[in-house]
């Protein structure tokens, strides 16, 4: 029997990797993920993508989280906004001055995926609200964890309920709803506590996740069947 796990409370898309995103009422979902999500990134001359960490694929570029981006109805290119929310007219020139790096540009995804791990992140309100006890003096907001879907879970749902979804599939009730296949949890890094508009530096957030849940948070999914997701959708597990 299908199990209702919650209601889609918010949908987030991040047109430019590692910058702030945009809230949506609904979104198309294809095999790659949410349409337009992380479709662009700040890329350097070596092909590394701007991020909050240094890895084989990524280059740490402090300050990206203070920026934001949106596509709106467009997929042909993002609008970039500075830390005060003002639109940026010449993104590449702005990024080079803002980051103090002369080899970066805003680039569309090509052969190298812009996703850290898997394309869709789902976070429960039960887990988000747990931080009220785990980090009571910290400003906690889902933007720190950059989910695509914030799912309103029933009262009494335990934190880290996302673990119970792994290995299963979920979809909304509408005939055209996308189907998600939950695979793993995100391994969190210092970006969870990085400052961004309205959210101060908070390193204790990552410490709480490491202590309570081995540094993992959310449920990451692949797209099992394309379709649409909407705020207010009830998601059921198969």
Report the location of each language-model feature.
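Metal-cofactor-dependent catalytic cores
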Residues: 1-238
């Amino acid at each position: 029997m299908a199990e209702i796990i919650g209601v889609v409370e918010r949908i987030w898309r991040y047109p430019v990797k590692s910058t702030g995103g945009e809230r949506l009422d609904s979104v198309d979902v294809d095999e790659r993920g949410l349409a337009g999500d992380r479709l662009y990134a700040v890329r350097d001359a070596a092909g590394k993508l701007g991020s909050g960490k240094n890895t084989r694929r990524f280059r740490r570029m402090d300050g990206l989280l203070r920026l934001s981006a949106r596509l709106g109805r467009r997929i042909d290119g993002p609008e970039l906004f500075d830390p005060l929310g003002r639109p940026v007219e010449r993104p590449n020139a702005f990024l080079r001055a803002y980051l103090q790096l002369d080899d970066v540009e805003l680039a569309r995804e090509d052969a190298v995926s812009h996703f850290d791990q898997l394309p869709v992140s789902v976070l429960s309100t039960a887990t988000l609200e747990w931080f009220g006890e785990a980090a009571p003096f910290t400003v906690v907001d889902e933007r720190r964890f950059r989910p695509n879907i914030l799912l309103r879970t029933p009262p009494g749902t335990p934190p880290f309920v996302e673990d119970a979804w792994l290995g299963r599939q979920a979809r909304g009730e509408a005939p055209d709803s996308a189907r998600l296949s939950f695979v793993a949890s995100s391994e969190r890094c210092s970006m969870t506590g990085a400052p961004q508009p309205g959210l101060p530096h908070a390193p204790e957030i990552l410490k709480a996740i490491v202590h309570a849940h081995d540094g993992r948070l959310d449920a990451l999914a692949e797209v099992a069947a394309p379709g649409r997701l909407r705020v207010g959708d009830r998601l059921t597990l198969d």
